[in-house]
């Protein structure tokens, strides 16, 4: 009877060790990218944008893409940089008038991984930076446009899984008119390289 119990215990230990080895190899790439200290992670985010408040009166829904860079500084905190372009559909606040505000965000920030130590799971993010706001209006046959560079801030939450992430953000594209330039974005991202 002792031989059976001993054999069963050895088999269970070996099976557990083999299973742990399989779990490590199945996430080999994500662990290598996520746990490397001071490694720059490069990716791309695609998002859908919905303007709020009075910003929604002159700007339609939009979509965009951003190049992302993440630099881990300590176990749960990374510095981030994101830059890209956001295209918005026309909005007609008055009959015969079409307006939109495209933007080029250049943002610096930080990302805090809440529950995990290997840069996986729930995270919170905060960003600040410049928004190049390209406003265009068409009235009848006449059109006009202007560019304004504004300072803005944002915050968001998301979830990181291997190289993929999903996040929801709220940004103010203009700190001078904080409540009048709010934008909610949601999207997915993929980290494709690490240096």
Question: What is each PLM-predicted segment?
Answer:
Residues 1-19:
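Gram-negative bacterial Sec-dependent N-terminal signal peptides
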Residues 19-71, 110, 128, 132, ...:
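Short glycine/proline- and aromatic-enriched beta-strand/turn motifs that initiate or cap beta-hairpins
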Residues 27, 48-58, 84-103, 132-149, ...:
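Flexible, solvent-exposed loop segments that connect beta-strands
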Residues 37, 72-76, 115-119, 161-164, ...:
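Outer-membrane beta-barrel channels and translocator barrels
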Residues 38-40, 59-63, 100-106, 120, ...:
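Residues that define the transmembrane beta-barrel architecture of outer-membrane proteins
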Residues 41-45, 78-82, 121-125, 165-167, ...:
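Residue-level detector of the transmembrane beta-barrel scaffold of outer-membrane proteins
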Residues 82-94, 153-195:
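Predominantly the C-terminal beta-signal and adjacent terminal strand-loop region
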Residues 111-145:
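Surface-exposed, polar helix/loop patches in the mature regions of secreted/periplasmic/lumenal proteins
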